[in-house]
């Protein structure tokens, strides 16, 4: 059934919103709070808008979306307010359609039995985090995701592990999908060819890295070969999650709410594109919209709807140091999978394919070993690393910034 156009908010409601906003600001000032610098948000906080930024009424929007076969809720993994929005949106959808399942990018499919035990109420939070090896497998703060998992358990909603092992994606980026034996593909089929826009976006992402993934592990490659494999690996990743979503929809008949990174869902590329190839052409894409985000991103294709967030204010707590890498465990230790552009790891010179042997004098055999060392690092300190690259050992120094910088 074709998706209905979103109905804009009436001028009367716009005026009411403006008056309420002015009143709220007046109260804030009278209460003695510091005045904020004037900011014009593309999407005001607390307002739903379509992909062009035009406000839409929330109840009709959620009613339409709740009946979609797949609803994809994007996120930036390290943003607490994004995860609160996901939880509240999930609750709203559940009120309109209790026949939901929740799909999570955060865990590989081998951990599905653990998720089943969680939903059945057989595990405490601590037992769940230990059984999933959360800090190693995903790494982002579990407190961001536990409220969503608790909601699913409370309502006995199936929770589905959408991902595959990161090593599969890393191998594809290094060697190409054709080089992966079928028995080692974790059941993932061949991805549909990406759209030209997605291909261009991924190429730009690869170029933004000081040292791109594929080129750092295969220095003789041409940039075109490196980019081709990088795009292919992303397609395999998207396909794996799309196949699991489609399977859940087919076997349960439930609407599947996907909790995924925005890069996998925006502009109907990535996972939505693979879902369409699998026969699910009418997935819905919802995104949180940060107050300081560029308004030019509201191009009409970014999402079916976005929700305006205010400037994030979190309780002050010590900033945990981040190296900025994804790690791939293996029989010989841990290998650097991806390196975030501009991260501590990138500045230190870490590359995809490097094997980390020692951190601060501590032998590193598993991702948890390195995580434990990093969590002990104070802001402004240096972390010596011993790595193996191209068969030779090297010494690098990761310099963590002073807190607040």
Label every PLM stretch briefly.
Residues 345-367:
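Conserved PDZ fold ligand-binding element
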């Amino acid at each position: 059934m074709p998706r209905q156009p979103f109905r804009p908010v009436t001028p009367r409601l716009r005026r009411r919103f403006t008056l309420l906003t002015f009143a709220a600001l007046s109260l804030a000032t009278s209460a003695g709070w510091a005045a904020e610098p004037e900011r014009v948000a593309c999407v005001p906080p607390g307002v739903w808008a379509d992909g062009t930024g035009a406000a839409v009424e929330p109840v009709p929007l959620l009613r339409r979306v709740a009946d979609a076969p797949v609803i994809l809720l994007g996120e930036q993994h390290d943003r607490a307010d994004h995860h609160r929005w996901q939880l509240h949106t999930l609750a709203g959808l559940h009120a309109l359609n209790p026949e939901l399942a929740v799909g999570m990018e955060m865990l590989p499919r081998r951990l599905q039995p653990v998720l089943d035990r969680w939903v059945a109420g057989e595990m405490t939070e601590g037992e769940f985090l230990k059984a999933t090896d959360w800090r190693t497998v995903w790494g982002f703060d579990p407190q961001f995701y536990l409220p969503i998992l608790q909601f699913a358990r409370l309502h006995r909603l199936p929770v589905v592990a959408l991902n595959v092992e990161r090593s599969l994606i890393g191998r594809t980026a290094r060697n190409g999908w054709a080089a992966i034996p079928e028995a080692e593909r974790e059941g993932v089929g061949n991805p549909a060819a990406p759209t030209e826009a997605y291909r261009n976006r991924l190429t730009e992402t690869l170029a933004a890295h000081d040292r791109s993934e594929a080129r750092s592990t295969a220095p003789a490659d041409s940039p075109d070969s490196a980019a081709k494999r990088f795009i292919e690996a992303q397609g395999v990743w998207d396909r794996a999650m799309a196949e699991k979503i489609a399977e859940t929809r087919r076997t349960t008949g439930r609407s599947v709410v996907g909790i995924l990174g925005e890069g996998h869902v925006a502009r109907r590329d990535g996972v939505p594109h693979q879902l369409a190839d699998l026969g699910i052409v009418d997935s819905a894409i919802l995104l949180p919209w940060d107050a300081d985000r560029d308004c030019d991103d509201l191009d009409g294709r970014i999402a079916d709807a976005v929700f305006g967030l205010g400037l994030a204010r979190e309780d002050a707590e010590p900033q945990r140091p981040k190296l900025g890498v994804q790690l791939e465990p293996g029989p010989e230790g841990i290998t650097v999978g991806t390196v975030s552009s501009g991260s501590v790891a990138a500045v230190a010179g870490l590359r995809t394919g490097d094997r980390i042997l020692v951190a601060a004098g501590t032998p590193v055999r598993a991702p948890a070993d390195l995580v434990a060392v990093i969590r002990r690092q104070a802001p402004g300190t240096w972390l010596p690393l011993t790595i193996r690259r191209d068969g030779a050992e090297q010494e690098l120094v990761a310099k963590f910034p002073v807190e607040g910088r």
